[in-house]
A protein has these predicted regions:
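Rhodanese-like catalytic fold shared by cysteine-dependent sulfurtransferases
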Residues: 1-34, 43-46, 62-117, 122-176
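Short, solvent-exposed loop/turn segments at secondary-structure junctions
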Residues: 56-57, 125
Length: 176
């Protein structure tokens, strides 16, 4: 856990950031490699890395009946990215934990060595948490872009409107 942040900003048991997500970031992330815009531009042009946007949802979260995200604001991200809202929070419920696991398996084609780049916006801990979480799931080639869409757009790179991946709602079984 970074020593510069207050202990109360982190979950003592897991080490995930759980509050004040928009704050100064450390230089490194456990389980991942930090990249700068120049590095990300090269990976983007090569096209062999999965880009994962973990910007949190703004609005009422996902609808527990349909799994659709109820957003108050639209989101633009790096073209070709998969947007998985809220998976960078410090504590996830069972549904969001499964959502994260299932979507990583899907976008990596089940290959835990598939290169994936996680980002949000500048000074956002969501990608830091998501990298740690993906690493604990056994994913090995993880990149962290802490400047996120802010840094990307600042260098005149394209951003495009995005829609989040719908949450799969598992039916509940009632014993009769």
């Amino acid at each position: 856990m970074p020593t510069s942040a207050a202990d109360s900003d982190f979950d003592a048991a897991t080490g995930y950031r759980i509050s004040r997500y928009r704050a100064a970031l450390p230089e490194t992330v456990p389980g991942g490699t930090r990249l700068y815009t120049e590095d990300v531009e090269k990976l983007f042009k090569k096209g062999n890395v999965v880009f994962v946007d973990v910007m949190p949802s703004t609005g009422a979260g996902y609808d527990p009946e349909t799994g659709k995200w109820r957003l108050r604001k639209s989101r633009k991200n790096i073209p070709g990215s998969t947007w998985l809202p809220d998976v960078g929070r410090g504590k996830l419920n069972d549904t969001l934990t499964r959502y994260f696991q299932e979507n990583l398996a899907r976008i990596s084609d089940g290959d835990k060595s598939r290169a994936m780049l996680f980002y949000c916006q500048s000074d956002c801990w969501m990608a830091w948490n998501a990298i740690r979480r993906a690493s604990k799931l056994g994913y090995t080639q993880l990149y962290w872009y802490p400047e996120g869409t802010d840094g990307w757009a600042d260098w005149d790179n394209p951003i495009e409107p995005s829609q989040p991946v719908t949450v799969t709602i598992k039916p509940t079984h009632v014993d009769q």
